[in-house]
């Protein structure tokens, strides 16, 4: 992937794709997606890849494809280029919906080395948005060196899944100025809310940091 790529390209190093949506059409177990540095601005009119909870959640990227044990699907900052990829969500403001940037339902996935910034809130009542939402059935994933910052959203929000490893990730400078009179509610850096038998075990947060968030 590259900010100057095109989804009509073949997705090679010299002719990369531009969007996660196109990548999701073609990836399979064992594939490595290299994300070049630069800013990936998600436009306001881009439809969500999916919605959940009767349309309440506007899920920008639906990460539903799974790898296999020993053959993960990897979404990695390109190690051969300097700088970080940055996904800018500041234009995505769906009226009456919660924003989830990466909605994780797939298993055996690896995410590493990129930022998510500018995630918005549009609902004025009690609500929340999330950079990563991990749900039941999303198992054995590695989230590594991700920086989730300068927005209005929770960094990581886990409601289910087994054996997920959140490693050396940062969430910072996140504050909701819109809902509940701008009181900054529901903007944790990291939240693990696995309630109920069978919803998930073995999830580990290691080396993660959170600062200047609000709840």
Walk through the language-model features, giving the residues of each:
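Right-handed parallel beta-helix/beta-solenoid
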Residues: 1-22, 26-29, 37-45, 79
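Right-handed parallel beta-helix/beta-spiral solenoid domain characteristic of secreted/periplasmic
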Residues: 15, 37, 41-127
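Beta-strand repeat architectures
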Residues: 24-31, 64-68
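A structural signal for short, well-ordered beta-strand segments and their strand-loop junctions
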Residues: 34-36, 157
């Amino acid at each position: 992937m590259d900010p100057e790529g095109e989804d009509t390209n073949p997705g090679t190093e010299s002719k990369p794709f531009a969007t996660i949506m196109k990548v999701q059409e073609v990836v399979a177990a064992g594939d490595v997606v290299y994300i070049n540095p630069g800013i990936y601005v998600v436009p306001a009119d881009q439809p969500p890849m999916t919605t959940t909870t009767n349309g309440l959640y506007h899920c920008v990227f639906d990460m539903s494809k799974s790898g296999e044990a020993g053959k993960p699907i990897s979404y990695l900052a390109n190690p051969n280029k300097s700088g970080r990829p940055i996904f800018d969500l500041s234009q995505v403001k769906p009226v009456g919906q919660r924003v989830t940037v990466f909605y994780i339902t797939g298993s055996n996935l690896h995410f590493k080395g990129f930022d998510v910034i500018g995630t918005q809130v549009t609902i004025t009542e009690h609500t929340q948005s999330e950079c990563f939402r991990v749900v039941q059935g999303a198992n054995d994933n590695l989230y590594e060196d991700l920086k989730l910052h300068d927005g209005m959203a929770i960094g990581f929000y886990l409601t289910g899944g087994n054996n997920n490893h959140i490693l050396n990730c940062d969430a910072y400078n996140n504050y909701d100025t819109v809902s509940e009179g701008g009181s900054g509610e529901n903007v944790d850096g990291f939240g693990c809310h696995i309630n109920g038998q069978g919803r998930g075990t073995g999830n580990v947060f290691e080396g993660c940091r959170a600062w200047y968030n609000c709840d």
